[in-house]
């Protein structure tokens, strides 16, 4: 046991150390070399709203220009002369009453950063600074979308190579349902899918090596998503790979009982969760040591708001916000045109009931696949638990947190597929068997007649 813990700790330290080293190295790129493309990007954000709709009033088409302006602002305030310190003590210019878009303009024109944002690692800077040498933010978004789609295709090809046709189709359906093409709308939407789809490739490629390997990969996943993501749909980084492994093992006849499945899944999720939290703790500790300031206070205060804060702009009490956090994410999944569009929720749930409920009714057999069904339903329910726990964050930012429901969609597809045995299929099979028996009987009778003539 102690050797395993040592191995997991070593993996955690190695991965985080690698990422931090890359962050420092890319921070050495002089700001003068990226200023031109940053100024082009700033021109775009100068005329953009903090949160803009790209298609009518549909919430899933919201561009989070607010977060992007802050990220570019932080990127600019990382000093190549002090890469270690400024990669930890991340700050931005808030722009005062004119907002963060104006703050980015001020930062590029010499104003010092005045707002601390050291609670995140801002790991995407590793890619953004080099890319800003060749293109502006719009080009980076297109490159990011291309990378996400390429990783998705690689996952589908790997599943097809393994003859996991249903799993490949369910992944494709889930990505379409969460509007995968819309991740191009904001820089902050990209990392969660880049990390999650990369981890899917690793989990699928190495899952036969055993559960210990999956736990090790879970550590890698926890570090990666904490380092690169902005708390968008972080649960995808562990739930998506795990549900794919569950379905692949079931189709190969290697999946255990429900209690057995829960045991190794809980271990993987715990490894992921511990490494996720520890990645943040290392950042706050390192930033506190480097600056001599207590970075824990603001970070923990911010975390508390996401757990139990309430929306001041909508004056929503906590008891109402908790269920509304779930409603908002379901609403956005179904194309809601407001934070909570009950009309779209009702229509969407009816469609889900017709498709999945009807599919299950028509295709299910007498023998229920209880172990795999319970397992995938547990995984599919986790995103809603996240929405309830981080209710303030999930309610206010449902336009990107809703994408975590991709796992739920795969789970629903799996419930129908894994329990299939339709009367129609069985009828055809029985008919074929009867026809085959009849033909065999005719052949035997014919042979007997011929034998009799002899």
Predicted regions and their residues:
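Hydrophobic/aromatic-rich transmembrane helices and adjacent perimembrane loops
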Residues: 396-418
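Membrane-lumen/periplasm interface segments of specific transmembrane helices
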Residues: 26, 262-353
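Transmembrane-helix signature of polytopic, lipid-linked glycan biosynthesis machinery
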Residues: 178-181, 226, 380-400
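Membrane-interface alpha helices of multi-pass inner-membrane proteins
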Residues: 215-242, 264-277
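Aromatic- and kink-enriched transmembrane "portal" helix at the membrane-lumen/periplasm boundary
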Residues: 126, 172-194, 222-227
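Membrane-interface helix-loop-helix junctions at transmembrane boundaries of multi-pass membrane enzymes
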Residues: 357-381
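Juxtamembrane segments of multi-pass membrane glycosylation machinery
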Residues: 126-144
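Transmembrane-helix motifs of polytopic, lipid-linked glycan transferases
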Residues: 145-169
